[in-house]
C-alpha cells in the first residue's frame, strides 16, 4: 500500500533512488538513479509457461498467472496434475482472461478452449491439415482463431553458437470457426509452393498477417530459408479471403527472416521478430525485435530494447502502451520475461526484468519462462473440472 501511494503521488514524474551500504563499519553511497512513473497503466496479470530449458525431454512444466500488482503467482495448470504431459501455446482473445485456449500434447492431447467458464476439448487433426493445430492467434471478435499447421523437426549442431535448429518441412495457415467447429483456408495460405506459419489478425479483424517462405528441402537448406512477412484481407462475415498478398517484409531484400507478427490492440504498430534465417527464433542468438509503425510505414530496429542475445516471443498490453518479450540476455540459456513501455509516438522505454520478491530468484531458478501474455484480469477456472475434461472428456472433431 505504501508503494502504491508512492507511485500514485509520482505519476508523470520521477522517483529518485539512493543506495547506501555499510561495510566494515563504514557507510558507502552509490550514485542515485531515477525511475520514471508513467500514467499509462499496465495490465494486472501476466501468464506464462515455466519449463526447464531442455531439447527433447521434459518432466515438470505448467502454465501460471502472475499478478503484477504484487508478487502473487497462481497455478493455472501444472502437468503433475495431468500425468506429466506437455502443455503449450496458451493464447487469449484481446487480453481477456475469460476467453483463452491452450494445447496439451502426448497424454490427454487436444486443444482446450475456455469461454466464460465453459471448457471445450477439441481434436484438431483433420484429413485436410498437415498436423493438429499449432500456433494460435485470436480474431478480435472471438469468433475465429487463426492457426498454423506444421510438420516440425529438430536437429542439433556439433559446433555452432546456436545449439539447436528447429525447422518445418511443411506448414500452412488455417482459420478455425469457434461456433461451427469448421476450418477454412485459402490457396495463398495453404500452398505446396510455400510454407506459411505464425498467423496474426489485425486489430479490426479485417486482415490476416502471416509469415511465408518458398518450400525447400530441409534440413539441407536450413541456413538459406528466410520468411517474408505478408498479409491478406479477411472478411469475417463471409469467412472469405482476398486474392492479393501484401508483403510488409521482403526477406530477399532485407537479408533476414521474419516471424511472430503481433499487431497492437489500437492498430498503430506491428511488432515482429527477425533472425538471420529460419522461423524458430528462440534458439537463434541473432534474433531481435522490430517495430513497424502502420501509420508512417517506418520500421524501428529497437536498438534500446534488443540485446546481444535472443529476443523472441512478444505480446501487447490491452492499451498498446506496454509489451512483454522473451529474452536470454542474462545468461544465454534461460528465457526470461522483460517488460517495456512504448509511448504513443512509438518511442520505447528501457526494458526491465519481471520483478520478483526475492532478489536472487532468477539466480536460483532452473526454469525458463515461455509465451508471456498480458491479460486484463485473473483467469477464473474450475481446475478440477478442467483436469476431469482433460483426462476423460470426449474431444470434438473439427470439420
Placement of each model-derived feature along the sequence:
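Sequence signature of WD/YWTD-type beta-propeller architectures
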Residues: 1-399
Amino acid at each position: 500500500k505504501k508503494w502504491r501511494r508512492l507511485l500514485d503521488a509520482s505519476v508523470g514524474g520521477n522517483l529518485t533512488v539512493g543506495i547506501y551500504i555499510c561495510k566494515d563499519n563504514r557507510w558507502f553511497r552509490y550514485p542515485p538513479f531515477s525511475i520514471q512513473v508513467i500514467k499509462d497503466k499496465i495490465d494486472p496479470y501476466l501468464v506464462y509457461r515455466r519449463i526447464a530449458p531442455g531439447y527433447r525431454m521434459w518432466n515438470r512444466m505448467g502454465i501460471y498467472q502472475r499478478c503484477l500488482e504484487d508478487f502473487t503467482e497462481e497455478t493455472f495448470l501444472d502437468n503433475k496434475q495431468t500425468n506429466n504431459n506437455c502443455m503449450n501455446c496458451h493464447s487469449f482473445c484481446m487480453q481477456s482472461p475469460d476467453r483463452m485456449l491452450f494445447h496439451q500434447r502426448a497424454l490427454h492431447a487436444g486443444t482446450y478452449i475456455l469461454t466464460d467458464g465453459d471448457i471445450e476439448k477439441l481434436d484438431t487433426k483433420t484429413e485436410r491439415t498437415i498436423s493438429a493445430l499449432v500456433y494460435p492467434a485470436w480474431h478480435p471478435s472471438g469468433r475465429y482463431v487463426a492457426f498454423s499447421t506444421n510438420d516440425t523437426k529438430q536437429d542439433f549442431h556439433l559446433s555452432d553458437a546456436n545449439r539447436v535448429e528447429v525447422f518445418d518441412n511443411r506448414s500452412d495457415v488455417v482459420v478455425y470457426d469457434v461456433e461451427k467447429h469448421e476450418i477454412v483456408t485459402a490457396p495463398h495460405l495453404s500452398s505446396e509452393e510455400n510454407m506459411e506459419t505464425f498467423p496474426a489478425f489485425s486489430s479490426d479483424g479485417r486482415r490476416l498477417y502471416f509469415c511465408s517462405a518458398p518450400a525447400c528441402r530441409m534440413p539441407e537448406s536450413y541456413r538459406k530459408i528466410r520468411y517474408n512477412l505478408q498479409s491478406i484481407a479477411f472478411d469475417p462475415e463471409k469467412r472469405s479471403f482476398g486474392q492479393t498478398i501484401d508483403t510488409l517484409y521482403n526477406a530477399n531484400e532485407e537479408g533476414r527472416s521474419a516471424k511472430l507478427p503481433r499487431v497492437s490492440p489500437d492498430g498503430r504498430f506491428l511488432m515482429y521478430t527477425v533472425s538471420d534465417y529460419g522461423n524458430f527464433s528462440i534458439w537463434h542468438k541473432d534474433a531481435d525485435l522490430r517495430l513497424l509503425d502502420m501509420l508512417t510505414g517506418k520500421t524501428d530496429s529497437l536498438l534500446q530494447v534488443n540485446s546481444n542475445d535472443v529476443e523472441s516471443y512478444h505480446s501487447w498490453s490491452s492499451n498498446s502502451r506496454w509489451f512483454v518479450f522473451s529474452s536470454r540476455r542474462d545468461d544465454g540459456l534461460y528465457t526470461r520475461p522483460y517488460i517495456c513501455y512504448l509511448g504513443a509516438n512509438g518511442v520505447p522505454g528501457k526494458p526491465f526484468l519481471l520483478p520478483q520478491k526475492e532478489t536472487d530468484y532468477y539466480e536460483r531458478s532452473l526454469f525458463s519462462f515461455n509465451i508471456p501474455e498480458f491479460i486484463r484480469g485473473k483467469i477464473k477456472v474450475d481446475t478440477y473440472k478442467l483436469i476431469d475434461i482433460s483426462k476423460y472428456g470426449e474431444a470434438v472433431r473439427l470439420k
